[in-house]
Regions:
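Terminal, low-structured helical/coil segments at or just beyond the last alpha-helical repeat
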Residues: 3, 10, 29-41, 367-409
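Alpha-helical segment of the N-proximal tetratricopeptide repeat
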Residues: 47-78, 91-95, 125-129, 159, ...
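Helix-start (N-cap) detector for alpha-helical repeat units in TPR-like alpha-solenoids
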Residues: 49-50, 83-84, 117-118, 151-152, ...
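Register position in tetratricopeptide repeats
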Residues: 61, 95-96, 129-130, 163-164, ...
């Protein structure tokens, strides 16, 4: 019986590239010119407070967060009701990895100036970063209520909805953000990703291409476009996009991993192996890259090397069901069926609807003359393949069950 060799890890089509460009950043434009009402609480009456505030802004923009923090604190000390200084202080604290302290400062700013949409927006960003999505959504909505044309708030509200799996709501917000700020490339990329998740590949591709038209060096958009093309069964075109993504972001391991998968799909195993190794060189703890490298080595029948990589993938990600299946395949090929059976069962315990794990387990059990258990696993595999509308594998399972029944009768 021929066993199905396991597929490349599906993680290549997740959003595993850097998301550094996928949020509009904080509202750092807390300069006085942005405040239209001269009688608002945010305006400083103390010139020294204003000078320290401006110094804080300048230092923040230069990346000197400690210096900016000190300047904003001096401004607040000189004028305790200086709402914009609290926002600036919150920004510096957040960028220093102190989100809870930042949240407190944004809330203080809001208490002093409840009409400042930027304070709600920045509070929303920080809450989202600490996975308080419902609270973040509430703040983005408050910002939008105060400023309906606030593109950044619509965009990040879309991000929060996407993180909650609310794709329709995310599309609505991204579409609104595009209407308000049509030249911001990441919005198109994010909209494309939602469409991708809905299985609308052509529409997703159109959005990724729009993102690239506004920012030709946008590595993430090239990467996502590559994923969509790969999903369409166009590995050659995917290779071109992954190569572009790598050229613009040469230290990001996800690009190399994805390029490796596209090359694997073209049957270029040596080239694929080289890309997986590059991915691992940039991130030695990249479990999926170790798994994919193992799969390529397995395809070359380099069993000891494949086993080493599958084992490493499992060490890095103990819930990596595909790695257990791959390891089981290699063990079985080495004449270690009992170890293989144990690994297949581990994969199934992690992913109970893993059709290929049941299928491969059944083959090994059949070879070991454990025919009753083999048939049970074949039937489970068939049920799952049927649900996936995988007619080819359903027919293959039927043939194997028939062979076992013929042999036992």
């Amino acid at each position: 019986m021929l066993r199905n060799k396991n597929l490349l890890v599906a993680a290549i089509i997740c959003l595993c590239l850097s998301n550094g460009n996928t949020t509009f950043g904080k509202d750092v434009g807390v300069v006085l010119a942005k405040i239209p009402d001269s009688d608002r609480a945010a305006l400083p009456q103390n010139k020294n407070a204003e000078a320290n505030f401006e110094q804080g802004n300048n230092l923040y923009k230069q990346g000197d967060f400690k210096g900016a923090e000190a300047a904003f604190r001096r401004a607040i000390e000189l004028q305790p009701n200086f709402a914009q200084a609290y926002i600036g202080l919150g920004n510096t604290l957040d960028d220093q990895g102190k989100p809870q302290e930042a949240i407190a400062q944004y809330k203080k700013a809001i208490s002093l100036d409840p009409q400042d949409s930027g304070a709600y927006f920045n509070l929303g960003l920080t809450l989202a970063r600490v996975d308080q999505l419902e609270a973040a959504i509430a703040q983005y909505k408050k910002a939008i209520n105060l400023e309906p044309k606030y593109a950044e708030a619509h965009y990040n509200l879309g991000n929060a909805f996407y993180a909650q799996g609310k794709l329709t709501e995310a599309i609505t917000e991204y579409t609104q953000a595009i209407r308000l700020k049509p030249d911001y490339a990441p919005t198109y990329a994010r909209l494309g990703t939602v469409l991708y998740d809905q299985g609308k590949l052509e529409e997703a591709i159109a959005q990724y291409k729009k993102a690239i038209s506004f920012d030709p060096k946008y590595a993430d958009a090239h990467y996502y476009l590559g994923n969509a093309l790969y999903a369409q069964g166009k590995p050659t075109e995917a290779v071109a996009e992954y190569t572009a993504a790598i050229s613009f972001d040469p230290k990001n391991p996800a690009g190399y991993n994805a390029l490796g998968n596209a090359l694997y799909a073209q049957g270029k195993l040596e080239n694929a192996i080289a890309q997986y190794k590059k991915a691992i060189s940039f991130n030695p703890k990249y479990a999926d890259a170790h798994y994919n490298l193992a799969s390529a080595l397995y395809a070359q029948e380099q069993l000891p090397q494949a086993i080493a990589e599958y084992t490493q993938a499992i060490r890095l990600d103990p819930k990596h069901a595909q790695a257990y299946t791959g390891l089981a395949n290699a063990m079985d090929d080495q004449g270690k069926p009992q170890e293989a059976i144990a690994h297949y069962k581990k994969a199934i315990s992690l992913v109970p609807n893993y059709a290929y794990a049941y299928y491969n387990l059944a083959i090994t059990l059949g070879r070991e003359k454990q025919l009753e258990e083999a048939i049970l696993n074949f039937k489970k595999a068939r049920e799952l393949f049927q649900a996936e509308e995988n007619k080819e594998m359903v027919e293959q399972v039927d043939q194997l069950i028939q062979k076992i029944n013929t042999r036992t009768n």
